Regions:
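Extended, intrinsically disordered, low-complexity segments
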Residues: 135, 198-221
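Short amphipathic alpha-helix initiation/capping segments at coil-to-helix junctions
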Residues: 134-138, 161, 185-193
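Alpha/beta enzyme core
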Residues: 9-157, 163-179
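Shared catalytic-loop signature of beta/alpha-barrel
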Residues: 169, 174-209
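N-terminal capping/small domains of soluble enzymes
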Residues: 1-5, 9-14, 196
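Generic alpha-helical secondary structure signal
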Residues: 14, 54, 84, 191-194, ...
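Contiguous, function-dense segments enriched for cysteine-driven chemistry
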Residues: 153, 184, 220
Length: 221
């Protein structure tokens, strides 16, 4: 009753294909292509990929060459129109989309060292901002993809600021087939998952909803 999603990121087409083969052989159920991580020290990786349609298309195709598993393309919010790379990924064979990753940012400066947070062994990099504050940004990008004619019927895995069952309902209502939670788990522990499931179950019982599928896209009608 559980699945394993392997998140991968390569630097070349060959690396993407090889990584896809490795995680497939390891037994994962779904592959998520990380085209969107802002914390990179190498050009042409992470969120740099997600803003480059040609790279999104090439790397998605490379992953598909290495696996028969479903492939999700994880989109960067550090772009004006997320539908552009999303369409490119789907045309290259992506089976679904995941959004959003963190917001490219500088989260603070250490006034003693004058280096940006987080500092690791004396080195810093542009960071990614996550948590409750990014939810409205996530909902906007997800809505854009959900109503895009070229992405009609493409499953979306939603994330970005989800902390409660109410947040989960909102993501589902805008078309997400499922949701992902990371920052809230880091803040509050794994009990947050139990809380979300419990709240969703109660909400469904109160509204006579038999399946979560009934909620998917309900806010788009």
């Amino acid at each position: 009753d559980r699945i394993i999603v392997a998140s991968i990121m390569g630097e070349t087409e060959d690396e993407w294909t090889q990584l896809a083969r490795l995680v497939t052989d390891a037994g994962c159920d779904i592959i998520e292509c990380n085209f969107s991580c802002p914390q990179m020290t190498v050009e042409g990786m992470g969120s740099d990929v997600g803003t480059n349609v040609q790279l999104v298309q090439a790397y998605t195709a490379a992953v598909k060459r290495g696996t028969t598993l479903p492939v999700l393309a994880k989109m960067t919010p550090n772009i004006t129109d997320m539908t552009v790379p999303a369409v490119a990924a789907v045309r290259a064979g992506a089976d679904g989309l995941a959004a959003i990753n963190t917001i490219k940012s500088i989260t603070g400066i250490d006034e003693e060292t004058m280096q940006a947070h987080p500092g690791v062994m004396g080195k810093t990099a542009v960071s990614g901002y996550s948590g409750k504050a990014v939810k409205p940004i996530a909902l906007r990008h997800i809505y854009d993809m959900a109503v895009c004619p070229e992405l009609s019927g493409v499953p979306i895995s939603g994330m970005g600021g989800i902390e409660t069952w109410r947040d989960a309902v909102q993501f589902l209502a805008l078309g997400c087939s499922n949701i992902q939670i990371t920052t809230a788990v880091m803040q509050y522990g794994y009990r947050i998952i139990t809380d979300v499931i419990g709240g969703l179950t109660d909400y469904m019982n109160r509204h006579g909803i038999a399946s979560l599928r009934e909620l998917v896209g309900a806010g788009l009608e």
